[in-house]
């Protein structure tokens, strides 16, 4: 499903106030990162068959001990990551891209893509680049659904603030 399809009829409210569930977050990826000017509305939504989406900031810390002051910790950065778990669904554009031969066995820039991650209630989130790491493209016991385990990890510059707007390049 394309992001533009998901957002049809949805209008985020910038001043939304209330409880938020994990289902209120949208993760969409560029399925054609080698093509210039892919519209964000054409990104593939990562949702079909996904039971778990664990968004982490993974702080990077430096710990030092100083005379008469003891230990001090300083945050020097964050490593954004997304852990995806769920069941394989063939025919879903996002899953088919993530689990393609080129991504599973690719390295370097060959597994890098753009992403947006935002809250559907207020449209606010972030935009950046991630490396796709496929840990498992199908596992489970006889008679069970074929499970997948994938990580997206930030690469390059920190993500930038993003607010959803239809048809943005």
Language-model features: where?
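Mixed-charge, glycine-accented linear interaction segment located at domain edges/termini
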Residues: 126-169
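Short, acidic/charged, Gly/Pro-enriched secondary-structure junctions
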Residues: 95-127
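Polar/charged alpha-helical tracts
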Residues: 4-8, 14, 100, 150, ...
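Solvent-exposed edge beta-strands and adjacent loop segments
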Residues: 2-85, 129-145
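Intrinsically disordered, low-complexity segments enriched in small/polar residues
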Residues: 14, 23, 41, 64, ...
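Beta-strand secondary-structure signal
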Residues: 81-85, 117, 149-153
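Solvent-exposed strand-to-loop "edge" motifs in beta-rich extracellular domains
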Residues: 87-89
């Amino acid at each position: 499903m394309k992001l533009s399809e998901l957002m049809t009829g949805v209008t985020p409210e910038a001043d939304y106030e209330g409880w938020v569930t994990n289902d209120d977050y949208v993760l969409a990826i560029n399925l054609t990162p080698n093509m210039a000017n892919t519209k964000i509305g054409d990104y593939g939504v990562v949702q079909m068959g996904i039971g778990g989406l664990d968004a982490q900031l993974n702080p990077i810390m430096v710990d030092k001990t100083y005379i008469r002051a003891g230990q001090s910790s300083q945050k020097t950065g964050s490593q954004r990551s997304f852990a995806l778990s769920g069941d394989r669904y063939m025919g879903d554009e996002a899953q088919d891209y993530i689990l393609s031969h080129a991504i599973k066995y690719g390295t370097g820039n060959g597994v890098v893509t753009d992403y947006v991650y935002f809250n559907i209630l207020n449209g606010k989130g972030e935009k950046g680049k991630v490396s796709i790491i496929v840990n498992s493209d199908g596992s489970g016991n006889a008679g069970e659904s074929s499970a997948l385990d994938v990580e997206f990890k930030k690469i390059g510059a920190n993500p930038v603030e993003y607010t959803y707007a239809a048809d943005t390049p």
